[in-house]
Amino acid sequence: MQLLCVFCLVLLWEVGAASLSEVKLHLDIEGHASHYTIPWTELMAKVPGLSPEALWREANVTEDLASMLNRYKLIYKTSGTLGIALAEPVDIPAVSEGSMQVDASKVHPGVISGLNSPACMLSAPLEKQLFYYIGTMLPNTRPHSYVFYQLRCHLSYVALSINGDKFQYTGAMTSKFLMGTYKRVTEKGDEHVLSLVFGKTKDLPDLRGPFSYPSLTSAQSGDYSLVIVTTFVHYANFHNYFVPNLKDMFSRAVTMTAASYARYVLQKLVLLEMKGGCREPELDTETLTTMFEVSVAFFKVGHAVGETGNGCVDLRWLAKSFFELTVLKDIIGICYGATVKGMQSYGLERLAAMLMATVKMEELGHLTTEKQEYALRLATVGYPKAGVYSGLIGGATSVLLSAYNRHPLFQPLHTVMRETLFIGSHVVLRELRLNVTTQGPNLALYQLLSTALCSALEIGEVLRGLALGTESGLFSPCYLSLRFDLTRDKLLSMAPQEATLDQAAVSNAVDGFLGRLSLEREDRDAWHLPAYKCVDRLDKVLMIIPLINVTFIISSDREVRGSALYEASTTYLSSSLFLSPVIMNKCSQGAVAGEPRQIPKIQNFTRTQKSCIFCGFALLSYDEKEGLETTTYITSQEVQNSILSSNYFDFDNLHVHYLLLTTNGTVMEIAGLYEERAHVVLAIILYFIAFALGIFLVHKIVMFFL
């Protein structure tokens, strides 16, 4: 239905002054016209605060032609509209037959029975919650007041500032259009403003005379347009450091689905972060373009909901789209201190939390990958309404444990598994950031498994992804692990040495990896581990391995008040390596646990596949020169058998050592064939020396008699 409302103001002139007595309303609904005359007094009663004087001033019908011409000349006009033929995707899928229709304003327990029940949310109540705030969409300030009529309405917005308040960006949006406004205050105090408007052409706001959209539109395709609103002076100023590729910006905004577009923006933010864009944002084209794209990501979700009219929006689509927005909201908050108002539905959050309450978290890892991801997205979206006793950490840990048990040793994560674990990681991040978790053992297991997955090959794969700008650099278990030994030099030694990779890109990737770690350092802190209180100097901690009943703290000094102290004392170890088991979370009474114990060696490691005698133990490998390599947590007989039947132990490398960490706090070195091979090598060397010496003596004797 298309509704066209035209208000005609009838002015009665009395004694040289204008007064408003009535409003004539013309309605044209799908070709059927109706006319109404409403007395002004009745309209004022229905709409209190409506000022005829303000309407008169806003209309500015008495503006002379010279002023209008001057206003027109000030506003920037595009050299021409770029017409592009673009395919617009069908974003929201059709609702399956029999889906339960849920009103966002009337969510109650039992409205949906479980994850397997198809459901959708009614569009109108949902849209109302997403655009709940009332604010000024089109301000009465220049240059906007030259082009638009002032507009206050229901809206949402994304706002951030850089360099104090000297540079601001606000992306204000309704379900119909988005206006992204850049505002910069120069050192001289001059203010420059530029706005980009995106939306369906027919839904863009009305313009003041004498403006028309063709002169302001930069790009157009089918239903959508991208418009620039600024003055020639302001445009010239912004053009010094902001030269966006409007064709690419517009094409992506039109052709990508809401969820995929949000993921694209998230990937851009990670790459910006690699370059130090969070710590010291540069006012350049890339940063400013990304700001606009962040607001487009939020707009596309709200716009898609609004486009369904009085329909119903599939719950799985909502879970996926709002998960992406939640992740995006978190990273721009951490990176730029950005504020997001609106684009949040308490009804959706409540429904997601209720659905998760029907799931047995400890069994989440047994579901199909599709259901795991759906549940974890719901967990993230519903987190604000779930409460601290929801057990969501247990669900994320169950999924990670399932992935770990079937993951090949020392292999980087494959694409599907990386995506699933990325979704689950956000539940963990939420509880870590809020410091409210009641899931200590599950959280410790989650971080232990993440540490075990943070192998050299995994690190190499992530560095490759960061260097090439692919999604494999977006997430790694390393970011939530308990590894604190990853320095720049160490990461460079783990980086892939490929001819196709530019070394400068690899170096930037290493910086980006470290940037991710520093950004998440608070999240990766060990505050929730009971053994945390036994550590006096966190900067000396290299790794933490929390097993059942005992937590091993690996450090570069002896200042850990553990139950015992072991030292990895080998000839070529470039830096000290101490292992401090903290049994039953009890710190030693003294300053440290005493003199280091010698690590006993197992010469013949028993290879058994009949029972899991090593379940609950951990294996830690280290290089005498490079330090810690990786750890493996033995969770099941399958993992144990995989270790024993594979090339896990590289005993040919005499500089790599393997330590077995047990649940009673004992540390043993698995020498395997190391000592035997060393003796063989030594015997061969001695035999060669003896043989050479014999030849030499024979030569001397022969020469003596000659």
From Swiss-Prot:
Glycans are attached at N60, N435, N549, N604, N664. Residues 704-706 are intravirion. N-glycosylated, O-glycosylated, and sialylated. One of its GO terms (cellular component) is virion membrane. Residues 1-18 form the signal peptide. Disulfide bonds join C120-C312, C278-C335, C454-C478, C534-C587, C612-C615. Keywords: Disulfide bond, Fusion of virus membrane with host cell membrane, Fusion of virus membrane with host membrane, Glycoprotein, Host cell membrane, Host endosome, Host membrane, Membrane, Sialic acid, Signal, Transmembrane, Transmembrane helix, Viral envelope protein, Viral penetration into host cytoplasm, Virion, Virus entry into host cell. InterPro entries: Herpes_gH, Herpes_glycoH_C, Herpes_glycoH_C_sf. Its main location: virion. The chain crosses the membrane at residues 683-703. Residues 19-682 are virion surface. One of its GO terms (biological process) is fusion of virus membrane with host plasma membrane. Residues 165-229 are annotated as: Interaction with gL. It is found in: Virion membrane; Host cell membrane; Host endosome membrane. It holds the Pfam family Herpes_glycoH_C. It is a single-pass type I membrane protein. The heterodimer glycoprotein H-glycoprotein L is required for the fusion of viral and plasma membranes leading to virus entry into the host cell. Following initial binding to host receptor, membrane fusion is mediated by the fusion machinery composed of gB and the heterodimer gH/gL. May also be involved in the fusion between the virion envelope and the outer nuclear membrane during virion morphogenesis. The heterodimer gH/gL targets also host EPHA2 to promote viral entry. Belongs to the herpesviridae glycoprotein H family. Interacts with glycoprotein L (gL); this interaction is necessary for the correct processing and cell surface expression of gH. The heterodimer gH/gL seems to interact with gB trimers during fusion. The heterodimer gH/gL interacts with host EPHA2 to facilitate virus internalization and fusion. Interacts with glycoprotein 42/BZLF2. This is Envelope glycoprotein H. It comes from Epstein-Barr virus (strain B95-8). The gene is gH.
